[in-house]
UniProtKB/Swiss-Prot annotation:
GO BP: any one term: tRNA processing
InterPro entries for this protein: Domain_X, Maturase_MatK, Maturase_MatK_N
Keyword check for Chloroplast: yes
Organism: Impatiens capensis (Spotted jewelweed)
Keyword RNA-binding: yes
GO cellular component, one term: chloroplast
GO molecular function, one term: RNA binding
Family per similarity comment: Belongs to the intron maturase 2 family. MatK subfamily.
Descriptive protein name: Maturase K
Keyword annotations of the record: Chloroplast, mRNA processing, Plastid, RNA-binding, tRNA processing
């Protein structure tokens, strides 16, 4: 938040078109460069250096009747005043994202102060969700595994912002730019379609922001209906609804949906349900019956298609009994393990045997997805056989070893919450041998000759076990406390899961 304050020094006359005026401030593009374009500009050719004047001319050109249409098949013609149009589109994309995120960031702080909520930075961690899962999932019966719909027209995404952003000029500029960017056959939106969420990963920050705004709109209504159906109101849900600023929507659904769905509310009385979403996937967990979960599945699919114009196949919503199902979520295979036990109980002179079943939330590290990621990043083939990283062969020896070691430490750090680390040992073997093959490739020697020359202990300090790192950092913790917690420790400093291919 403090970073944005220096870029918001506007006159009162500019307050009406607050966001639109920011589109022509050089400081915004400097901030956009600092956030996402550093690597792009540093690796750019000499003719790709940008200037604010070219950006302003490009914005002005979009409003002209003679709009420029560029061909992706002829990249040499994709020039605007002698500069590469693709570069300026990326700059505009990043700047639009920064500008649209400003009102959301400004609104979040007053909300927290008004609710007197204590700010814990650890709550930002992805791992902060797992203690909640451990506490709630062991008492649940059914889990609904949901893949969110992803085919959304760009116009629908822009219209979603109208409930938050009251600046019509900035919305018109955003709409102009998105349609023009489609005409330029961008690397984000396929030429054959204007529907969002292609699987290419370049410059998707703005589209992720728009898509999450649309999903939050659906979630606000879903949580509202869920709160109407239970006696115990969720404080966090109410805070979430107020935070995303859907007052107009809420008033509408209070009048319409509360009447239309009154006949269905009796089905869900006293139903304890937990909702978690990450990226394009969400899960519903409940203590209810299979019949009730089927009702929720029917409701969700119809809500998406009728109210939000998001087509979803019923097969994307799967209902499973938690005792016989492993949930693939956030890089873990999670399940509820049943541990039976027997105990003797005595009442007066009679003693009898009691059978107990203890449910425990269990997490396992999946092997196949990890090997698939290593294969995608060219550390191994699809079968997990290590290969050399050809693109790193020109780096120094210490740099190569450090890169491989950092990847393994990050993976070990993230998956430290699982007591079963067999998959990590396989990953460690693949990365170590891939590192050796890369070094041997650089020195133009065979792997066996390289190991005889430098020794196998060369890589040990870079592939230190996560448990050893933890012991070095927490030497003052007593042995009893470490034994009590075992090896399952959730690190609350992990904000994202980085793709291995981006480690370069």
């Amino acid at each position: 938040m403090e970073e944005f304050k220096g870029y918001l020094e506007l006159d009162r006359s500019q307050q009406q078109d607050f966001l639109y005026s920011l589109s022509f401030q050089e400081s915004i593009y400097t901030l956009a460069h600092d956030h996402g374009l550093n690597r792009l500009i540093l690796n750019a050719d000499s003719d790709k250096k940008y200037s604010l004047l070219i950006v302003k001319c490009l914005i002005t050109q979009m409003y002209q009747q003679n709009l420029l249409i560029f061909s992706a098949n002829e990249p040499k013609q994709n020039l605007f005043f002698g500069h590469n149009t693709d570069l300026y589109c990326r700059i505009l994309f990043e700047a639009f994202t920064v500008i649209l995120e400003i009102p959301f960031s400004l609104r979040e702080r007053p909300f927290i102060e008004r609710k007197e909520m204590v700010q814990f930075l650890n709550l930002r961690s992805i791992h902060s969700i797992f203690p909640f899962l451990e506490d709630k999932f062991s008492h649940s019966n059914y889990v609904v595994d949901i893949l969110l719909p992803h085919s959304i027209h760009l116009e629908i995404l822009v219209q979603t912002l109208r409930y938050w952003v009251k600046d019509a000029s900035s919305l018109h500029l955003l709409r102009f730019f998105l349609h023009q960017y489609h005409n330029w056959n961008s690397f984000i939106i396929p030429k054959q379609s204007r529907f969002f969420f292609x699987k290419k990963k370049k410059b998707q920050r703005l589209f992720f922001f728009l898509y999450n705004s649309k999903v939050c709109e659906y979630e606000s209504i879903f949580i509202f209906l869920r709160n109407q159906s239970v006696h115990l109101r969720s404080i966090s849900s109410e805070a979430f609804l107020e935070r995303i600023y859907f007052y107009e929507k809420m008033e509408y659904f209070l009048e319409v949906y509360a009447k239309d769905f009154q006949a269905f509310f009796w089905l869900f009385k006293d139903l304890f349900m937990h909702y978690v979403r990450y990226q394009g996937k969400c899960i519903l967990v409940s203590k209810g019956t299979s019949f009730l979960m089927s009702k929720w599945k029917y409701y969700l699919v119809n809500l998406w298609q009728s109210c939000f114009y998001m087509w979803s196949q019923p097969g994307r919503v799967q209902i499973n009994q938690f005792s016989n199902y492993s949930l693939d979520f956030l890089g873990y295979l999670s399940s509820v393990r049943r541990n039976p036990s027997m105990t003797w109980s005595q009442m007066l002179e009679n003693s009898f045997l009691i059978s107990l079943v203890i449910k425990k939330f269990d997490t396992r590290v999946p092997t196949i997805p990890l090997i698939r990621s290593l294969s995608k990043a060219k550390f191994s083939n699809i079968l997990g056989y290590p290969i050399s990283k050809a693109s790193w062969a020109d780096f120094s020896d210490s740099n190569i070893i450090d890169r491989f070691g950092r990847i393994y430490r990050n993976l070990s750090h993230y998956h430290s919450g699982s007591p079963k680390k067999t998959s990590l040992y396989k990953v460690k073997y693949i990365l170590r041998l891939s590192c050796v093959r890369t070094l041997a490739r650089k020195h133009k020697s065979k792997v066996r000759s390289f190991l005889k020359r430098f020794g196998s202990g060369l890589l040990e300090e870079f592939f230190m076990e996560e448990e050893q790192v933890l012991t070095l950092n927490l030497q003052k913790i007593s042995f009893t406390l470490r034994r009590f917690y075992g090896r399952q420790i959730w690190y609350l400093d992990i904000f994202c899961i980085n793709d291995l291919a981006k480690s370069e």
